[in-house]
Amino acid sequence: SPMPVLAATSPTDCFECAYMASKIALEHMTPVVLLTDAFVANGSAAWKLPDLNDYPAINPPYVTPDMAGNWTPYQRNEETGARYWATPGTEGFMHRLGGLEKDCITSAISTDPANHQKMTDMRQAKIDYIANEIPELEILGNPEADLLVVGWGGTYGHLYSAVESMNAIGKKVAMVHFNYINPMPKNTEEILRRSVSYTHLRAHETLS
């Protein structure tokens, strides 16, 4: 099933990514995968406890009293595709919960192939919309680079150091690094299409 995927770049970035993963999960009513790795787990850094007032507010799509009577469990926001959240015990919004796939409107268990495809398409559209709310990619390093290095997650520090070292000896190297893997930032295609002007495009998943 389509779902958002984030990757933390460093120990200090873990809080930021966890907060944003929670914001996406609660506002868009979707599971979120947050990736870390050995570089992040075994690293350390000084980190100041942040002021949560400096972070964007989390606004779940709760049901409202005026929706009672016409509400269905899988009713969605037309713009975002997110389902409305009726917390257990809310008067007028009784519904069933479970892990099996449900009818796209009623929440009754469904094994109908057409309903399954429709639900998958709706989930994908919901995930695609999230790209409107995440930051765009930033190109680091030499803006006139011959080589673009692409990385994600805990490889950030190693790749950035390598890019800086290469530029220091006269090589022309740039870098983009992904925190948001699904959906990708909206300018991803634009940046990677520029690779036609790069002599080389190199993606790194691990370091060796």
Model segments located where?
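Single conserved hydrophobic/aromatic residue that forms the stacking wall/gate
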Residues: 203-208
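C-terminal substrate/ligand-recognition segments
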Residues: 148-159, 166
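Conserved thiamine diphosphate
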Residues: 1-33, 37, 58-69
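Short acidic, glycine/serine/threonine-rich loops at helix termini
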Residues: 16-19, 43-49, 160-161
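Generic beta-strand/beta-sheet core signal
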Residues: 8, 33-37, 150-153, 176-178, ...
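Conformationally flexible catalytic loops at phosphate/diphosphate-handling active centers
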Residues: 32-138
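Generic long, charged, amphipathic alpha-helical segments
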Residues: 159-191
